[in-house]
């Protein structure tokens, strides 16, 4: 059986992305046919910064039509508009290749959101771009590993804005799309307020969540969604035995327990998209860039998910 062709966007080159590419290539090449969306010259510079620890000649790299950012000992670990623009163009090229079915899926390495902002990229990050590119699809950010997956009803929005987003019909649409994409038989839904609202004592959002759960289960014809569960106990061991699938109303409520338990191995999956896209579940790690300290478990798991 032929190996799948995977486009790998480079992420912010001032972070750990290029180290992950170089140190993981042999393992990645065993799972798939990787196409690295980065100029070969930058891979060579990265290897020099890593004391020429890796072999670069066999890597299949595709040049990006964007000015090459500086990459040297004085730029690493620093936010740069040039690096932001380059990482965006690498990601956009990956999407174009997936749209034209020249690759089977894409794996995105971490970007710096402030670098995108400085480069005047009009998107908060990868998922925001996908939501705009594929507007007819409800793109869902799900993070996790085989032991625990968390779907985010809201992702990169201020916590103060989440309450207004929690509306019954919007949540029903989200829940049904999440179930369709994951084929989960049971999904536990975290509440929004302390004690899941305590029957309206601590806010009305959880009453909306309950109505959305009831309507979604009725549509499906079985009791798929459980909750809303008090979020402070939703991830207790006895709860995680029920199902690995969860939904959180906000970013940190769902991801804090996930990363406490499975930070190194978790991945980021864009559900319900017309293309297959996964990412590492960590940032650029500027503080350890080009020190040969980057853990590649999340990256390898992302590749395995696609392959």
Swiss-Prot record:
It comes from Helicobacter pylori (strain P12). It is an enzyme of class 1 (oxidoreductase). Its EC number is 1.1.1.262. GO terms for biological process: pyridoxal phosphate biosynthetic process; pyridoxine biosynthetic process. It comes from the Bacteria. Catalyzes the NAD(P)-dependent oxidation of 4-(phosphooxy)-L-threonine (HTP) into 2-amino-3-oxo-4-(phosphooxy)butyric acid which spontaneously decarboxylates to form 3-amino-2-oxopropyl phosphate (AHAP). This is 4-hydroxythreonine-4-phosphate dehydrogenase. Homodimer. InterPro entries: PdxA_epsilonprot (IPR037539), PdxA_fam (IPR005255). One of its GO terms (cellular component) is cytoplasm. It catalyses: 4-(phosphooxy)-L-threonine + NAD(+) = 3-amino-2-oxopropyl phosphate + CO2 + NADH. One of its GO terms (molecular function) is zinc ion binding. The gene is pdxA. A divalent metal cation binds at residues 156, 195, 251. Belongs to the PdxA family. Substrate binds at residues 126-127, 259, 268, 277.
């Amino acid at each position: 059986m032929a190996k799948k062709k995977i486009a790998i966007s480079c992420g912010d080159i001032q972070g750990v992305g290029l180290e992950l590419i170089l140190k993981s290539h042999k393992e990645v090449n065993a799972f798939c046919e990787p196409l690295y969306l980065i100029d070969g010259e930058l891979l060579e510079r990265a290897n020099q910064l890593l004391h020429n620890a890796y072999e670069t000649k066999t890597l299949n790299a595709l040049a990006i039509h964007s000015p090459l950012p500086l990459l040297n000992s004085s730029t690493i670990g620093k936010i740069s508009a040039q690096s932001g623009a380059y990482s965006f163009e690498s990601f956009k090229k990956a999407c174009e290749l997936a749209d034209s079915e020249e690759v089977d899926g894409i794996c995105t390495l971490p970007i710096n959101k402030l670098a995108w902002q400085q480069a005047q990229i009009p998107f908060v990050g990868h998922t925001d771009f996908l939501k705009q590119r594929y507007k007819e699809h409800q793109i869902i950010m799900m993070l996790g590993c085989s032991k625990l997956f968390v779907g985010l009803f809201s992702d990169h929005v201020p916590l103060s804005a989440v309450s207004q987003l929690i509306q019954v019909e919007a949540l029903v649409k989200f829940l049904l799309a999440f179930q369709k994409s994951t084929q989960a038989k049971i999904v536990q839904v975290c509440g929004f307020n302390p004690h899941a609202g305590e029957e309206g004592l601590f806010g009305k959002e959880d009453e909306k969540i309950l109505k959305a759960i009831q309507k979604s289960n009725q549509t499906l014809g079985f009791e798929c969604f459980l909750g809303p569960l008090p979020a402070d106990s939703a991830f207790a061991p006895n709860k995680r035995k029920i199902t690995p699938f969860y939904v959180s109303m906000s970013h940190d409520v769902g991801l804090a327990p996930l990363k406490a338990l499975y930070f190194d191995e978790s991945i980021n999956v864009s559900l319900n998209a017309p293309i297959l896209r996964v990412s590492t579940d960590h940032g650029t790690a500027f503080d350890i860039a080009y020190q040969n300290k980057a853990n590649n478990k999340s990256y390898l798991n992302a590749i395995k998910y696609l392959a």
